[in-house]
Amino acid sequence: MRLLWVCVCWVPCLAAADWPQWRGPDRSNVSKETGLLQEWPADGPPVRWQASGLGLGISPVSVAAGRVYTVGNRDGAEYAFALDAATGAKVWATRLGATVAENSLMRWLTQRSPTVDGERVYTLTANGELFCLRAADGQKLWQKNYATDFPTRRPWGYCDYPMVDGDRLICTPFSINGMIVAFNKFNGEVVWTTLGEGEGPAGYGATVMSTAGGIPQYVFLFRNQLMGVAAEDGRVLWQHLRVDLRYGGTYTPLVQDLRIFSPNGYGGGMAMFKLTACGDEFVAEQEYHEPFNFDAFQDSTVLVGDHVYTFGPGGKPACIELGSGKVLWEKETAHGTKRAALTYAGDRLYLRHINGVVSLAEVSPAGYTEKGSFKIPLHEPSMGVTFPVVAAGRLWIRDNDRLFCYDIRAGGTGGGPVPPQDVLLTLTAEELAAEGSAAGPIRQGRDRAPDAIFIPTPDDVVERMLGMADVKPGELVYDLGSGDGRIVIAAAKKHGARAVGYEIDPRLVELSRKKVAEQQLDRLVTIEHEDVFTLDLSKADVITVFLYPALMERLKPQLQKLKPGTRIVSHQFEFPGVPAKQAVTVESKEDNESHRLFLWTAPLPARKPAPQEAPR
């Protein structure tokens, strides 16, 4: 059977190597790249560059016309970034608006990769603001607001994947005022709107284009309904109630001729529907429904021929026969527990596991054969997983604040090893102060949104950090971003130190204060509800920190004022451009992960020169 994913208006104007939107040019999550490595070296493919400073988030990259686009949360705001694909240097950064305070676990699981269409870039904030940016310099051309124009229940923030079709931008606010809306892509005017019905939270899946039955249409999940609407005017062509669709679908339907495969997480299983033409409309009949425990958050499916490759329970790769829904195999690997994401290119499956392992596999209905793996350097734990992207002979892997570019071409560079570049993305005063639609200049103070989610440091790593700092009785320890208070409690309880934890999240402040009181450490330990970037740190003897490189960079003015001899220990990340006095790797028995620790002593040594950024 022929795979029918139609992007007629896009394909002629795209370079073969581009990946300009969520799940690629045709939203199949299958790259058309050729000439790629079929097996990786023992330590993985070579890194061409890595860039840090994107901020918190797991949005995948979009690649088009020699640039890489993504979005992230840093300095109290959401930013859209454009980087030079060859070097990782920043081309521009545009502040979209203030970071919204949502559920601390869920807010970073939405993908929201930008959509690139020639001279324009379209992106959505978690607050529901849709922007059209100029690709050349990030200038805002127009914007809309889902929250005011198409309100709906969004318990975990907004997530949409704008799709360009000719001169229209197709968006899914998933509101009863507009479950799907066609905007004029040039000026943002509404062309048509399809009204929704029913109550309940909106979904988080993407829309795909199809020409099933010779009628151009958009296929998507709306609440508990799978449906198709006409591309011409948004009229509903068909719909089917999926009573097993739970918590809002996160998966993109897979379309093959007149058949539509609909997966869903939370135990919703998988269903196949067949469309039958009835005049200028269709009837959708369910052919089968089979149980399968797809990942609840990740849209990890690819359709290759007549088989679907995805992840099953525990992050195990799996193969499903499309025609019957039969699970042909599930593979137990050494890498995956919990969550994972995948893509397909050059007859290989690329898998990105939540523990930071990236692997390459040859897959077929007969089985799964691994062809190499590596672990992301200094992997940053996260509640979600960013999708790998294969484009322009490169594998793009985002790890929260950082983006890695790997060369996966079969021929390599042809000129021998190339030293990888390490780029720190800094923001200009203009970029920091630029007004977003939701707020003015960057906020400071304890009432703003956190810069990072709380990820507990294992207790055995905590003890190694304090030992590395040589904490002595009576010394003053500051923990910046103290979370549940475990570091300051350990410093007092095991080392006899006085300790202050600074935390911006009021819920964590309350939690850690209770823990301090329960252990009767009130005389030695204090928990302060503060913004660490506003503090005077000069009295500390020891400082512990677990922050992204861009946030470490913001601490620089405060750290330069430390008294001589103050020890600074960082978990996982180096202070950008400043060589550490000592660096160690700790193998934690608590989480079975490797953790990097770095030590500096004040005054800090001179910075290493940073790579130059591309001109704007």
Task: Please identify what each model-predicted range represents.
Residues 550-609:
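C-terminal substrate-binding/active-site "lid" region of AdoMet-derived donor-dependent transferases
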Residues 486-496:
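Conserved SAM-binding loop of SAM-dependent methyltransferases across substrates and taxa
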Residues 498-503:
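Conserved SAM-binding motif I beta-strand of class I
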Residues 16-433:
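Noncatalytic, solvent-exposed loop/strand surfaces
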Residues 538-554:
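A short SAM/SAH-binding and catalytic strip from SAM-dependent methyltransferases
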Residues 428-472:
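Class I SAM-dependent transferase core
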Residues 474-483:
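Conserved class I S-adenosyl-L-methionine
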Residues 505-539:
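S-adenosyl-L-methionine
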